[in-house]
Amino acid sequence: MEFSLFFFSSCFDSQDDRSSNSYRLLLDAAKFADERGFRAVWTPERHFNPFGGLFPNPSVVSAALAMITSRIRLRAGSVVSPLHHPIRIAEEWAVVDRLSGGRAEFAFASGWHSDDFVFYPERYEDRSAHMYEQIAQVQALWAGQSRKATNGAGREIEIRTYPRPVQNRLPLWITSNGNAETMKSAARLGASVLTNFIGQDAEELAGKIADYRETLESSGFPRGAGRIAVMLHTFVGDDLERVRRIVKAPFIDYLASSLTLLRKLAPNATPGAAPGGIGLEEALRDPAVARKLLDFAFARYWQSAALLGTPDSCGELVRSLEEIGVDEIACLIDFHDDYETVMGGLEGLLRLKERFDPSPAPAAR
């Protein structure tokens, strides 16, 4: 099992959050991971909401990380490709690849929130189809192929993108929140998969991984092709009860910040079942019910869907994920907003990592 770091912190419009200190944890944790054999650093793409709001463009963030790291892979989790022109995706990430000496990777995602699509509103309904078209387009541009485009004078021209990346072949990932067909589609392309436990549990994921591996093989890819990375909220310490005291309040606050997205989406959402059988929109309008939802969510994560605990207690989950075919755990560490606490937790995470992956990260290729 390999381990990487994942970032998705909330930001709020305060004076403190307008300083460079907002990114201090990202930069220092990335250097820690780079020096201690972690596989990658993942950063997301988020727009128009404090939840994940520090990360509107993962290529910019990855370019900064390229300047302070030397070995670790620099990944977007994810690039919401329907919000971009494929030419710009190829150009921006080629810069990251050049700056990092060939360490750029990114996961394509189709997006989900309609507000994000102010860039290309017409793409929202068919966003998944757009994503798969763009995957082929970006792969071709990355490989140095030209593509036709219409210029400002209305003429059709052929363009190639620059700079040329270090890696001849784009390391391809696709993000899935638990959709089995998305994972099979990734397998048909030979793509790796970034997933999570938001819409599935370990038992469900096990079946999807088995189908993914079978589809890879039937699509002509060699055994060992394709990787499965699972994002897990992470804080590892020495004492289980102390860890619980440290993480519970900030974790619930972090989950609460994500509810602002759901509140905006709820009027257009298909009602879901909340504890007690009420609909999603009704639950989010009632603070007491919303709090029960958050407590329910924390209990689920604590028990079986996060690396919250000690190396011993978290090791059980790591072993179970290994058994179902997970290759990498992407550890989301910045749900806690205290710099010293999170950096201290990295030492516990390192001890856990060394039980399963004692080798250093490979040098940049």
Place the predicted regions along the sequence by residue.
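An alpha-helical appendage that flanks or caps ligand/catalytic pockets
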Residues: 5, 125-161, 203-326, 359-365
